């Protein structure tokens, strides 16, 4: 059995097949892969707001995470000899621990789009995003990021 939590969405879309091929190579017939990772729409309000902030400045916002649907990912699993026994895409609003939770989340998990950018500009874009999303994601003194997760339980059959 191979178990994975919150890893696959960090791997580029063009490397997903290689990932699954390698997992399949390391399981015997009947072996299971159980995984959960970011699914289509994960943190979309944050990414959309950042994208608007970049565009306002004539910059392109790179979407660096891979967030598929069940329908997009199941064929990859099937191609490498897995039978999908369970698959679900679901909302999982995720509370951030501090009042600065959204800024902290952006700085911790979404650094790549800001690489090479002047820190003052980074802060300006983040501040705009925080203010734009405050009414939507700041609830009862806590930031709640709009996570969407995808979960699979698959079994190798060939």
What is the role of each PLM region?
Residues 103-107, 149-158:
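Core SAM-dependent methyltransferase catalytic element
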Residues 65-80:
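Short alpha-helix
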Residues 17-32:
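A short glycine-rich, Lys/Arg-flanked "PGG" loop and its adjoining helix->strand segment in the class I
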Residues 32-59:
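Conserved class I S-adenosyl-L-methionine
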Residues 9-11, 26:
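A short His-aromatic
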Residues 85-140:
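C-terminal helical/coil "lid" or tail adjacent to the Rossmann-like core of SAM-dependent
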Residues 8-9, 40:
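Active-site beta-alpha loop architecture of Rossmann-like, nucleotide-cofactor-dependent enzymes
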Residues 3:
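A conserved beta-strand element that flanks and buttresses the S-adenosyl-L-methionine
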């Amino acid at each position: 059995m191979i178990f994975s939590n919150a890893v696959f969405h960090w791997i580029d879309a063009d490397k997903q097949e290689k990932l699954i091929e390698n997992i399949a190579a390391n399981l015997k017939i009947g072996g299971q892969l159980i995984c959960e990772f970011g699914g289509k729409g994960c943190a979309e309000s944050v990414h959309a707001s950042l994208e608007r902030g970049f565009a306002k400045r004539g910059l392109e916002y790179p979407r660096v995470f891979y967030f598929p649907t069940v329908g997009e990912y199941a064929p990859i699993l099937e191609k490498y000899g897995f039978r999908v026994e369970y698959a679900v895409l679901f909302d999982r609003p995720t509370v951030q621990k501090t009042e600065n939770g959204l800024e902290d989340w952006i700085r911790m998990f979404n650094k790549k789009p800001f690489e090479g950018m002047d820190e003052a500009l980074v802060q300006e874009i983040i501040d705009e995003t925080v203010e734009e999303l405050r009414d939507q994601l700041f609830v009862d003194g806590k930031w709640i990021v709009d996570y969407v997760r995808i979960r699979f339980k698959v079994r190798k059959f060939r």
